[in-house]
Amino acid sequence: MEHNKVDTEPQDSYDDQQKWVLDSSTDSRGEIPLRAQTGAWRAALFIIGIEFSERLSYFGISTNLVVYLTTILHQDLKMAVKNTNYWSGVTTLMPLLGGFVADAYLGRYGTVLLATTIYLMGLILLTLSWFIPGLKACHEDMCVEPRKAHEIAFFIAIYLISIGTGGHKPSLESFGADQFEDGHPEERKMKMSYFNWWNAGLCAGILTAVTVIVYIEDRIGWGVASIILTIVMATSFFIFRIGKPFYRYRAPSGSPLTPMLQVFVAAIAKRNLPCPSDSSLLHELTNEEYTKGRLLSSSKNLKFLDKAAVIEDRNENTKAEKQSPWRLATVTKVEEVKLLINMIPIWFFTLAFGVCATQSSTLFIKQAIIMDRHITGTSFIVPPASLFSLIALSIIITVTIYEKLLVPLLRRATGNERGISILQRIGVGMVFSLFAMIIAALIEKKRLDYAKEHHMNKTMTLSAIWLAPQFLVLGVADAFTLVGLQEYFYDQVPDSMRSLGIAFYLSVLGAASFVNNLLITVSDHLAEEISGKGWFGKDLNSSRLDRFYWMLAALTAANICCFVIVAMRYTYKTVQPSLAVVADGGDDVETATGTNNTSKFT
């Protein structure tokens, strides 16, 4: 009888794993979620839906922002590009604050609600700036200088949208990923697809923004476009709230900075103690005692920090668990600090890619403005920002081919369930960004030569179709690197910091926007010092964007070499198995397997 009880225990554990979600998440009532009623794609679709509307609004504004600044606010090229980069930089750095608030205090769902409300406030103010008489851009339809009140209202509105995006982006994407349990084999595979399809939905929003919304802004009016964006965001917010019973929630875990500081203090305090060669002698909780995420295995890098987990006196009656966390840390806490330190070089060497990516919404669009955008045989003129749709289409096509064709083939060839490692995917995209800059330099040189041949005649311009290759190739780069960065930072950060993980990925683009401004200023100044003429004039025909693109290509090539070296030395995190159950065939199956802890870049 006892023998039968032992035999059934593994099966009972397996049945519980299939019925319940055992990853410390809760349902809308605060209870352990039922797998069949919560999470997975039934919840993720609501989340992807509101992301569609957020990207619709963001790109409806950002891709046409340089046009707005030069035509409505009458700023010159350099000032318009810099203001666009400043706004983009702030917008993509704000998620660091939003992710911190989500992980530490409000939770991801609560942060999404607050951020979306602020986002809507920005959209409403943007709409009012076009319809309230005192806030309108001009007294008449034609004016040389816009009202100061309109300019102030406009910038307040778009920076409110920045704040909203700061809470929305990291919380929503990580909240969507939380709907898939890492410890469940089927849901873990779904999560790998989730990031690809998240970006497909995101690109659908971008595609609609740069075609429909941009056309409305150019041909009907910015005010009408703002009304549409506000209505779409409000509607999707309402639908997102309807999905509340289907979501899985994670409670905020408090400030992540305190445990990190505790590890450093403990390691310094015990710097003179020997570190045991056997990592099992270091202090760690059991799976049953640890309720906030998963336990991590000890790694061989940054061994100095392991001293924080050294137990000073094993003969003491006081249990190690009751010692001050400022004196004794767990292996998991130590490894979480190591993870964040190891991410710094990866983050830094992806900035060059971010600089290349920022060109698509600034200089690429400005090029399109002065080129022939007529559709052959018709009088229809394509709005310049609509060329950004080529990037969205390229991402959708590339992600689909990668997910449906390349991953199955690569999975069989490499044995990696992702097909290739995350860092390999990022590296491939960086190579495509290099190609995009080379193509952009060649096309811009051709455009300048064409303009000189026709004596800068504004009626004789090169067709904008020549810009298609640089947009398309940059889209392929985004499909590999941006999606890879999302997955990398979400997967490799500590479980309690996953909103911040998404913020780290976005901060690459934010920091790159400021780096781009610095490069514009420095390169323009140096060119003027050397040759007497800068690379950025009042308009494109008096500028030398081709040389700027060549400079970016050279920097990207050097950066790729550095990235490969860092990636080859990178150590992925390893998660301890939390439960072993018996599968149908009788083999042991780990329900929380860790990523291989050796670099898989090569």
UniProtKB/Swiss-Prot annotation:
Pfam families: PTR2
Alphabetical UniProt keywords: Membrane, Phosphoprotein, Transmembrane, Transmembrane helix, Transport
Residue(s) carrying Phosphothreonine: T111
Xref: InterPro entries: MFS_trans_sf, NRT1/PTR, POT_fam, PTR2_symporter_CS
Stretches that traverse the bilayer: 56-73, 87-107, 112-132, 152-172, 197-217, 220-240, 337-357, 381-401, 422-442, 465-485, 500-520, 548-568
An example Gene Ontology molecular-function term: tripeptide transmembrane transporter activity
Membrane-protein topology: Multi-pass membrane protein
Compartments, as annotated in UniProt: Membrane
Family the entry assigns: Belongs to the major facilitator superfamily. Proton-dependent oligopeptide transporter (POT/PTR) (TC 2.A.17) family.
The name this protein goes by in its record: Protein NRT1/ PTR FAMILY 5.7
